Structures are given as C-alpha cells and as structure tokens.
C-alpha cells in the first residue's frame, strides 16, 4: 500500500496545477461506490477501522437499492508513484447514475475536468452509462475507460475492452482493468488520473466565481452547499451573492470533505468544497447557480443553469385522513433536501385531502414515496402517475393539465403531450419484441446501431405518458432483464387524447379519471369497469358502473342488487299474491335507487390505483 502523503496542502493555498477534479460514470451495480471506497482507503482519508461498504451513500435507501441519489465530493491527497515528492489533490465527485437525476449529473460533470468511465466486465456498457458518457463528451472531459469486476468468473475483459475502445476512440490496451472489491489496479488508476486529467484553469485574481453542483440540508447547520471554485477565491466570513436569485448571505463556514467535513479559511481556484451560510431552505442555493462575492463580485454568471422541471405528477393521499398535517410536514422536510420536488394541496371527493406532487421521473417518485413511508411512517395511496398536457381550445384559450380532473370540457382544438427520445440497449435477439413493445406504445423508430455483433442500440421517440406507467417492467420481462433504458425529453407533439371518466351509479369518481389515447380508451374503460365490478360489494339496489368519454358511455358493467326472497312465506297459493309481493319489492328497490349512494371501499381504490396490479395489464394491451 502506498505511503500516505505527510504534507497535504491547504484548500486556500493549493497550486491549481496539483489539483485534479474527476467523477465516476457508471451504471447501477457496476461497482462505483465500491471503487470510491477503495480510493478512500488507498489515499488514507478514512481509517481502516472506520471503513464501511458504500461509505459515501449516506441515505438508507441509497444503501439498500444500491443507487446514489445525492452527489458527494471528497478531497483525496495522492502522491503518484512516478513522482513521490508532489502531493496532488484529487477531488472525486460522486454522481448519481440514474436518468431522473440527469441535471444533477450534468452539473457534477461541469465541475470536473475528467471522468472515469466504469463498466462491469461481466455485463458491458448500459444505456444510462452511454447517456452520461455523451454528456461528459459534450462537456469536453478527458475520459479514462475502466473495466471493473475482473475478478468475477463471468468477466469477459477482452470483449468489453474492445466495445469500450470503439466508443471512446482509444486502443483496447488503454482500457484499465481493475477489481474495486479486491483493490487490484486501483493505485494504477489513481496514477492515471494524475497523468491524464488536466489541471483546472482559472484566474486567481479575478472576482470569485464558484458553481453549485449540489446542496443538502443538515438539521443542525442548515443548508450545506457544495461548490467548485472556477475563478478567484472565497474566504470565510465574507458576504456572498447567489447570481440567479440575487440573495446575499454571510459565509459562516467554508471547507472541504475528506469525507467528513473539515473547515478551512477559504477555497482557491479549482478547489471543490462546501459552504454554510445558515440558510434553512435548499431552494436558496440552486444546483447550477453561480456564487460570487458581494463586494467586487463577478458580473457574468457561469453558463448552464436550469430550473429543474417536474415531468411526472402523482396525487399522494394519506390512508388515514388525520395524517394530512404529518404528510405536509414530511414533504416540507424532503423539499429542504430536494429542490426538484414540487407539490400543492388538492382534494379529491373520493380520497379526501392530499397533495399533487411533481417529480423528475419514475425513480424519483418511487424514492420519495418510499422515504415518506419509511422515514416518516406514513401510509399513502398514490394515484396513477400522469404527465403535463397542454390543451388548446377552439376559442384559442390554453390550459395546462397536471391532473385528469383539470381536463377541460367543451370544444378542444388540439392536445399537446410531452415526448421523450428513448435509447434502449439490448442483445440483438430481442430486437423484434422490443420494437413490437414500442409500436404498441405509439413509438416512432429513430434509428438503430449495432455496438457489437450481439448488442444493439435502438432509438425511439415515445410519448412520456406511455413510459411512466409500466413500460420499464414490460421491457425487462420481454428481454429477460437484459435491456436497459434511458430517456431524455425532446419537446411535445399533438395527439388525439381523451379523458375517460368512471361513473358509479351516475356519479363521477374523480380518482379513477384518466387521460388516454383515443385508440386505447375503450380497452382502458372495459378493464377498469370489470375490475371495479369485482371490487365493489353488492348493494341493496342495482349499481351501474360506466366508463364514459364526455357524455358518451363506452363500457358498462352492472352490480346486481342483493334481493331478499319475498316469496319464502307463500306456500303454493295464488300467482297474483306472489306478483303483488314481487311488485312491492321492485317499488322499494326503485325508491332505494333514487336516494341510495354507493360506498367505494378503501381496498378498491388501493387495488385500482396501485401500479403493481396494473403492471400486468398495461394500458396499451388490448
């Protein structure tokens, strides 16, 4: 094991020529967090006895699902083997790898000069890794291709080294082969980072400019903002200004992560560290924003800042109505740590009080829902996720619809729905079933490339609404789990969409309304009324369940009335006597039907709205 450097330069006085900022791009489960663990051990910033697996993934849900959700930055001192005298500072920025968090990934990449492209030697490159690799190439980062898990019996390093070399445009021999688990080759990799990743370039005497690439909420210190200094220097106790909001704060503490927080007197050009200003709301320090000094500050912000826009909406309702204040408090707390989460209160006649919540994508929705249930102990019903539609009426007015109940009645000119460009990577034998699935989901083929003789990249334009429900599950089952999917929004298109309402006994039940394509509306209506017929208990009167588009009914099932045997007391006897009793019963049922109302049991809502149940019978199926 290499010697731990004895002299580590101060963050405010480090020569930028000795700094290397890099990140690791990898697919879920390709060993990124394990590689980060080995680097922490090799550089000696974490003692052997304090080491635990996935050291940087702090949230339980991150450790359990094996995914990274929040970016982390760690300062690692390293003396390369060819030059023991010069201690270099390696800033490793750990990025989320999932498609929902692409904006965070792009900001993390903008804070680096180089990236390690980490690929599992037993599985090869996946769609999300490919998407992040293209992002890295757009940011002109130096790419170091690495194959991990070469100690696995199933590893095929030669085959995948060739695939990587073709993608990155290097020689297959230049692809490093490491095992993060055993630590094999990790020191060579760190030497290569020092040798190949360029040093940060910045003007030391210019006004300070630093880019925020992440912010987290700490219950004791408020918001901790992670920044990369581009120009100038930020010092403790000076006043700083956020360039997108114009808000000013005092720097109470500044420092670096190694991986625990170490305060310093300032951060110089090229350094990566944290700022604490005592602010209590993450939305005050937005990812991608530029921080500068209030006195003699910079006039021009760094490019690339975007406000995160929710793509998928879902209603969250507490099972027990009295939990509503707890749900509000829980969402407030989560929003402190997640600026992309938006929500507003809404009421549903069927489900009571709840919130309409906007998410970046399906994983984001899943993670938030799981955190609400686990960390705050809430039992929730989530309505089927839906996307944002733009409806233009014949009189030219425009409506934005995030909830099926907001879909306007009357004469509609056109409806716009968001579309995404999806990239699917899969073995070539599954091309047919993947294309069939995409066609049923109203997809348009954009192109197809063979990465090697047995792996193909298929590109489709698909409506986002067709993906948000169960597309990924269907894709996995059709390809025996081998396909991987990545998507990015590419605007909107006009579609013939309609709103399907479910009527119980003539009354609309808002929780079951859905916006679907005209061709799939009939199948959706038939499926839902059949399901409700099984779930709603029989009443003392007949209950029609109807699916309707506007005033046109497209499907109907009837729950027959429970009838008492009124003829039981007639032994034999006259037919007119029996007829009289039956007529009397019929009258009573008719009166009941006039005033009766149908109670939909909670289980019926849960069964219809839970996506697990609908995953088997997706909307696209006929």
From Swiss-Prot:
UniProt subcellular location: Cell membrane
GO cellular component, one term: plasma membrane
Reaction it catalyzes: GTP + H2O = GDP + phosphate + H(+)
Example GO BP: positive regulation of translation
Enzyme class: hydrolase
Domain tr-type G: from-to ranges: 17-201
Record's bilayer topology term: Peripheral membrane protein
InterPro entries xref list: EF-4, EFG_III/V, EFG_V-like, EFTu-like_2, G_TR_CS, LepA_C_sf, LepA_CTD, LepA_IV
Gene3D superfamilies: 3.30.70.240, Elongation factor 4, C-terminal domain (3.30.70.2570), Elongation Factor G (Translational Gtpase), domain 3 (3.30.70.870), P-loop containing nucleotide triphosphate hydrolases (3.40.50.300), Translation factors (2.40.30.10)
Residues annotated for GTP binding in this entry: 29-34, 148-151
Keyword set includes rRNA-binding: no
Enzyme Commission designation: 3.6.5.n1
Taxonomic superkingdom: Bacteria
Cited PROSITE patterns: G_TR_1 (PS00301), G_TR_2 (PS51722)
UniProt keyword annotations, A-Z: Cell membrane, GTP-binding, Hydrolase, Membrane, Nucleotide-binding, Protein biosynthesis
CDD domains reported in the protein's UniProt record: EF4_II, EF4_III, LepA, lepA_C
Molecular function as annotated in GO: GTP binding; GTPase activity; ribosome binding; translation elongation factor activity
Function: Required for accurate and efficient protein synthesis under certain stress conditions. May act as a fidelity factor of the translation reaction, by catalyzing a one-codon backward translocation of tRNAs on improperly translocated ribosomes. Back-translocation proceeds from a post-translocation (POST) complex to a pre-translocation (PRE) complex, thus giving elongation factor G a second chance to translocate the tRNAs correctly. Binds to ribosomes in a GTP-dependent manner.
Family: Belongs to the TRAFAC class translation factor GTPase superfamily. Classic translation factor GTPase family. LepA subfamily.
Name of the protein: Elongation factor 4
Organism: Streptomyces coelicolor (strain ATCC BAA-471 / A3(2) / M145)
Gene: lepA
């Amino acid at each position: 094991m290499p010697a731990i450097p004895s002299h580590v330069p101060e963050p405010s006085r480090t020569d930028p020529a000795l700094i290397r900022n890099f990140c690791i791009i990898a697919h879920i489960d390709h060993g990124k967090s394990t590689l980060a663990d080995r680097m922490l051990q090799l550089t000696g910033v974490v003692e052997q006895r304090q080491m635990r697996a996935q050291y940087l993934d702090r949230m339980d849900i991150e450790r359990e699902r094996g995914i990274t959700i929040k970016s982390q930055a760690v300062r690692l001192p390293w003396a390369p083997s060819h030059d023991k005298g010069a201690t270099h500072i390696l800033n490793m920025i750990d990025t989320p790898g999932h498609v929902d968090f692409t904006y965070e990934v792009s900001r993390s990449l903008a804070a680096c000069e180089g990236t390690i492209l980490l690929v599992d030697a037993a599985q090869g490159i996946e769609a999300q890794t490919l998407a992040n690799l293209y992002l890295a190439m757009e940011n002109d980062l130096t790419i170091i291709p690495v194959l991990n898990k070469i100690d696995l019996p199933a590893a095929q390093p030669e085959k995948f080294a060739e695939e990587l070399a073709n993608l990155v445009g290097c020689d297959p021999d230049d692809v490093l082969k490491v095992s993060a688990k055993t630590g094999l080759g990790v020191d060579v990799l760190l030497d290569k980072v020092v040798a190949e990743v360029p040093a940060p370039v910045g003007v030391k005497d210019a006004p300070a400019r630093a880019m925020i690439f992440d912010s987290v909420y700490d219950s004791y210190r408020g918001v901790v903002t992670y920044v990369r200094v581009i120009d100038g220097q930020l010092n403790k106790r000076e006043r700083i200004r956020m360039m997108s909001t114009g808000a000013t704060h005092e720097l109470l503490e500044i420092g670096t992560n190694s991986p625990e927080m170490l305060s310093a007197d300032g951060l110089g050009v090229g350094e990566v560290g944290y700022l604490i200003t005592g602010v209590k709301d993450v939305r005050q320090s937005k990812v991608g924003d530029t921080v500068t000094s209030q006195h003699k500050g910079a006039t021009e912000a760094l490019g690339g800042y975007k406000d995160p826009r929710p793509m998928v909406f879902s209603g969250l309702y507490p099972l027990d109505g009295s939990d509503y204040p707890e749900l509000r408090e829980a969402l407030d707390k989560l929003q402190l740590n997640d600026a992309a989460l938006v929500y507003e209160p809404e009421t549903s006649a069927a489900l009571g009080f709840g919130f309409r919540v906007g998410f970046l994508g399906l994983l984001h929705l899943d993670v938030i829902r799981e955190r609400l249930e686990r960390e705050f102990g809430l039992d929730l019903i989530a309505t089927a996720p839906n996307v944002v539609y733009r409806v233009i009426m014949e009189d030219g007015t425009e409506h934005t619809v995030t909830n099926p109940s907001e879909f306007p009645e009357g004469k509609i000119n056109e409806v716009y729905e968001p579309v995404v460009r999806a990239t699917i990577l899969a073995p070539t034998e599954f091309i047919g079933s993947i294309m069939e699935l995409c066609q049923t989901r109203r997809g348009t083929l954009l192109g197809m490339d063979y990465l090697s003789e047995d792996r193909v990249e298929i590109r489709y334009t698909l409506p986002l609404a067709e993906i948000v429900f169960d597309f990924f599950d269907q894709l996995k089952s059709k390809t025996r789990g081998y396909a991987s999917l990545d998507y990015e929004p590419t605007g909107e298109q006009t579609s013939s969409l309609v709103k399907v309402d479910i009527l119980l006994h003539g009354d609309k039940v808002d929780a079951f309304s859905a916006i679907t394509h005209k061709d799939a509306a009939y199948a959706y209506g038939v499926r839902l009324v059949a399901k409700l017929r099984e779930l709603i208990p029989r009443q003392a009167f007949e209950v029609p369940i109807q699916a309707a588009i506007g005033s046109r009914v497209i499907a109907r099932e009837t729950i027959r009335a429970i009838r008492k045997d009124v003829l039981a007391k007639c032994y034999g006897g006259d037919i007119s006597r029996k007829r009289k009793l039956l007529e009397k019963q019929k009258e009573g049922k008719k009166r009941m039907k006039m005033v009766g109302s149908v109670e939909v049991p909670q289980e019926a809502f849960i069964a219809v709205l839970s996506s697990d149940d609908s995953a088997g019978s997706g909307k696209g199926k006929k």
